[in-house]
Amino acid sequence: MSARGEGAGQPSTSAQGQPAAPAPQKRGRGRPRKQQQEPTGEPSPKRPRGRPKGSKNKSPSKAAQKKAEATGEKRPRGRPRKWPQQVVQKKPAQEETEETSSQESAEED
């Protein structure tokens, strides 16, 4: 603590007699580039990317086959859209009430 108290009265730049502005190397604008690291030891073999070679010839598992059968109509990816079949599948008593509500919502737009 006493060493800090003595140096606090004098700024470090004036004590050394060197202005801080001139740096040993002028830096360029933007993000500094990453320093190249020298390889140490054996280089590790790169692992192949993507699908393994023989994976397409295998038959799907039983769980995957059940899942494929369980899913009905295949829908496209992305934002879910309203499909007209959903309205047809509902009970006739509910359809009448939905038709009136759908007409009201159409008038609001």
From Swiss-Prot:
Q: Give the source's domain of life in one word.
A: Eukaryota
The molecular function terms of the Gene Ontology recorded here are: 5'-deoxyribose-5-phosphate lyase activity; C2H2 zinc finger domain binding; cAMP response element binding; DNA binding, bending; DNA-(apurinic or apyrimidinic site) endonuclease activity; enzyme binding; MH1 domain binding; MH2 domain binding
Q: Where is the signal peptide?
A: none
**Keywords, ordered alphabetically:** Acetylation, Cell cycle, Cell division, Chromosomal rearrangement, Disease variant, DNA condensation, DNA-binding, Dwarfism, Growth regulation, Mitosis, Nucleus, Phosphoprotein, Proto-oncogene, Repeat, Transcription, Transcription regulation
**Main location group:** nucleus
Basic residues bias spans? 46-56
Residues modified as Phosphothreonine: T40
List where Basic and acidic residues composition bias occurs. Answer: 66-75
Cell compartments where the protein resides: Nucleus
Residues bearing N-acetylserine? S2
Region annotated Interaction with E4F1, chain positions: 44-63
Residue span of region Disordered: 1-109
- What's a BP term from Gene Ontology annotated to this protein? adrenal gland development
What are the Acidic residues biased-composition ranges?
95-109
- Does ATP-binding show up as a keyword for this record? no
Subunit-level organization: Interacts with E4F1. Interacts with NEK2.
Q: Which disease is it linked to?
A: Silver-Russell syndrome 5: A form of Silver-Russell syndrome, a clinically heterogeneous condition characterized by severe intrauterine growth retardation, poor postnatal growth, craniofacial features such as a triangular shaped face and a broad forehead, body asymmetry, and a variety of minor malformations. The phenotypic expression changes during childhood and adolescence, with the facial features and asymmetry usually becoming more subtle with age. SRS5 inheritance is autosomal dominant.
* Function, in words: Functions as a transcriptional regulator. Functions in cell cycle regulation through CCNA2. Plays an important role in chromosome condensation during the meiotic G2/M transition of spermatocytes. Plays a role in postnatal myogenesis, is involved in satellite cell activation. Positively regulates IGF2 expression through PLAG1 and in a PLAG1-independent manner.
> What name does this protein carry?
High mobility group protein HMGI-C
Q: What is the lineage of its organism?
A: Eukaryota, Metazoa, Chordata, Craniata, Vertebrata
